């Protein structure tokens, strides 16, 4: 694993798994029924915003995650728990 192979070099290796994300391109093509179905796919009954997804990447790239490696950060609004 990348995290194991490079830990001695103080290199962190993590991944992001993103859930359903709001995007104007999709909203413009969805009927109100499709939009309601997509929104209901998460525990918060809405899609994630792009900035919410980006915050995970910012966290992993920051010093705040200096002791985080070998993990997958799941940002999906509870989609996988549902």
Predicted region positions:
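Short, small/polar-rich loop/turn modules that mediate ligand/substrate recognition or access, typified
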Residues: 7-12, 68-70
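A glycine/serine/threonine-rich, flexible loop-to-helix segment
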Residues: 8, 15-42
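A short hydrophobic alpha-helix cap/turn motif
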Residues: 4-8, 21, 48, 61
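C-terminal substrate-recognition "lid" of short-chain dehydrogenase/reductases
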Residues: 46-75, 80-81
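Conserved active-site helix of classical SDR/Rossmann-fold NAD(P)-dependent CH-OH oxidoreductases
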Residues: 4, 11, 54-55
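Active-site helix adjacent to the Tyr-X3-Lys
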Residues: 1
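Active-site beta-alpha loop architecture of Rossmann-like, nucleotide-cofactor-dependent enzymes
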Residues: 5, 24, 80
């Amino acid at each position: 694993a990348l995290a194991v192979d490079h830990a001695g070099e103080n290199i962190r290796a993590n991944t992001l798994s993103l859930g359903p994300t709001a995007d104007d391109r999709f909203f413009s093509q969805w009927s109100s029924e499709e939009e309601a179905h997509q929104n209901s796919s998460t525990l918060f009954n809405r899609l994630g915003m792009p900035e919410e997804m980006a915050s995970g990447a910012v966290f992993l790239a920051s010093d705040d995650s200096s002791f985080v490696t070998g993990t997958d950060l799941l940002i999906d609004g509870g989609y996988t728990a549902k």
